[in-house]
Amino acid sequence: MPKVALLNQTGTQVGDIELADAVFGIEPNEAVVYDAIVMQQASRRQGTHDTKGRSEVRGGGRKPWKQKGTGRARQGSIRSPQWVGGGTVFGPTPRSYAYKLPKKVRRLALRSALSSKVANNEFIVLEGLTIDAPKTKDMISVFAALSIERKVLVVTADYNETVVLSTRNIPGVTVVDAAGVNVLDLVAHDKVIFTKDAVARVEEVLA
């Protein structure tokens, strides 16, 4: 079982915490992690692109010149695709790019990302995270005590509005609850901070 230090908000070690092997101690599967990231990014695409076909472009109802006798190539509409200003052939239309990998694959990707963070010493567990009032400087003090200077993902057991409001003005900081942990956020941040209760929630679902 992987064991990591259990810290308080001042950065002092108050004990150790053993993490579930099945969640935090597996051999990371990079291919599955990649597939999960592509799935998430595809789901975030707007898909609002649109082009007009020959039936949608304004004009072109009249035949530009008679069929025979001009010596020119026959044409039926100035909005045919070969004309400048004509319709687009097989152009993009609004669509959803979202798709879902099988649940087992998604969970394997999440376990792989978590295990990778633990193996690379990028995983921090706090005994608790309590902020009395929404104050950015209080969260900055916590990060300073934990020697965190770069992008960090904070995971709480439940939605914590005070923590969310205290971090929203700090660049590179993302806060999610245990149910919202995802592969893209884990990979995109240099450090991950879990509260002790959040670890228990994640293990309950993924173990």
UniProtKB/Swiss-Prot annotation:
GO cellular component labels:
ribonucleoprotein complex; ribosome
> Which residues fall in a compositionally biased region of kind Basic residues?
60-71
A single MF term (Gene Ontology) = rRNA binding
Pfam families found in the cross-reference section: Ribosomal_L4 (PF00573)
Q: How does it assemble?
A: Part of the 50S ribosomal subunit.
UniProt family annotation? Belongs to the universal ribosomal protein uL4 family.
PANTHER family xref list: 50S RIBOSOMAL PROTEIN L4 (PTHR10746), LARGE RIBOSOMAL SUBUNIT PROTEIN UL4M (PTHR10746:SF6)
What protein name is recorded for this chain? Answer: Large ribosomal subunit protein uL4
The gene name reads rplD
